A protein has these predicted regions:
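N-terminal loops that bind phosphate or other acidic moieties
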Residues: 2-64, 68-139
Length: 139
């Protein structure tokens, strides 16, 4: 089943995601983006156009930057209004989860597959503390 991807964020974060996806995976041109609030132009028509473009035999994924933020709320409202059960919304998106969904081997995305991708893509703390044993190596 074909997947259509939209990344909608406050400011130009979506454009940054698209650039990174192009560099890392050559997939930037396949992704639609909405950079909300960078001008006075209402982004709702772009959102509605994406939602309407997802056919019954396709799946759509909308990534948003902040759960409960205005972009996320608008996406949820428009998907519910369109009654499209084949469109998923993933909020608090990061580059890792977008890559995971794009390269998913699942022919049909399921809630479980998306939750697994989210869990694998969690933010990680990289430990930068030097252990005391390392200091002894210098003497």
């Amino acid at each position: 089943m074909d997947k259509k991807i939209l990344i909608a964020t406050h400011g130009e974060l979506a454009k940054g995601f698209q650039s990174s996806l192009n560099i890392l995976a050559g997939k930037g041109d396949e992704i639609q983006v909405i950079n909300a609030y960078v001008s006075d132009e209402d982004y709702t028509p772009q959102l509605v156009e994406f939602i309407e473009s997802v056919k019954e035999n396709e799946q759509g994924v909308i990534f948003t930057d902040l759960f409960g933020g205005s972009v996320n709320q608008k996406a949820l409202t428009e998907v519910l209004t369109a009654k499209k059960e084949n469109i998923f919304i993933i909020s608090n998106a990061n580059l890792a989860v977008v890559l995971s969904i794009i390269f998913s081997v699942e022919n049909v995305l399921t809630k479980e597959a998306i939750e697994a991708a989210i869990n694998e893509s969690q933010v990680k703390l990289v430990e930068t503390t030097i252990s005391s044993d390392d200091e002894d190596d210098f003497f």
